[in-house]
Amino acid sequence: MYKMQLLSCIALTLVLVANSAPTTSSSTKETQQQLEQLLLDLRLLLNGVNNYENPQLSRMLTFKFYTPKKATELTHLQCLPEELKLLEEVLYLAPNKNFHLTDIKELMSNINVTLLKLKGSETRFKCEYDDETATITEFLNKWITFCQSIFSTLT
């Protein structure tokens, strides 16, 4: 008889403890910080590309990039590294007084490190790409929007 009351008491205690626990775990906060860093780096790249003094912009817009279909989850970030090498090569066409090669290299390195942290060692994800290609500005804007969307679901 007392055994049942004791088990009920333990169950209620566990429910109370679980409900009063903080809702944002440290891993979620870390993911948010990494997404913020990725967003910042992607925006800096976009600003460098869209710089009104960039004489190579029209040439850069001729290169086409692939974006994933319906990117809605954090795992879709695994599709980004596949296009980063081309992105880096295209960005090297555009160095100017406001967007130096060292800046490009540093931003690309930051993005690669951040992506590695965010996606972890998971490599089984198969990317499905959209049939339509994107220009460099569309590509960066889509990834910025994706990161903002994921970030908003974490907050």
Curated annotation (Swiss-Prot):
Glycans are attached at T23. InterPro entries: 4_helix_cytokine-like_core, IL-2, IL-2_CS. The keyword Secreted applies. One of its GO terms (molecular function) is interleukin-2 receptor binding. GO terms for cellular component: extracellular space. Disulfide bonds join C79-C127. Residues 1-20 form the signal peptide. One of its GO terms (biological process) is adaptive immune response. The keyword Kinase does not apply. Its main location: secreted. Pfam families: IL2 (PF00715). Cytokine produced by activated CD4-positive helper T-cells and to a lesser extend activated CD8-positive T-cells and natural killer (NK) cells that plays pivotal roles in the immune response and tolerance. Binds to a receptor complex composed of either the high-affinity trimeric IL-2R (IL2RA/CD25, IL2RB/CD122 and IL2RG/CD132) or the low-affinity dimeric IL-2R (IL2RB and IL2RG). Interaction with the receptor leads to oligomerization and conformation changes in the IL-2R subunits resulting in downstream signaling starting with phosphorylation of JAK1 and JAK3. This is Interleukin-2.
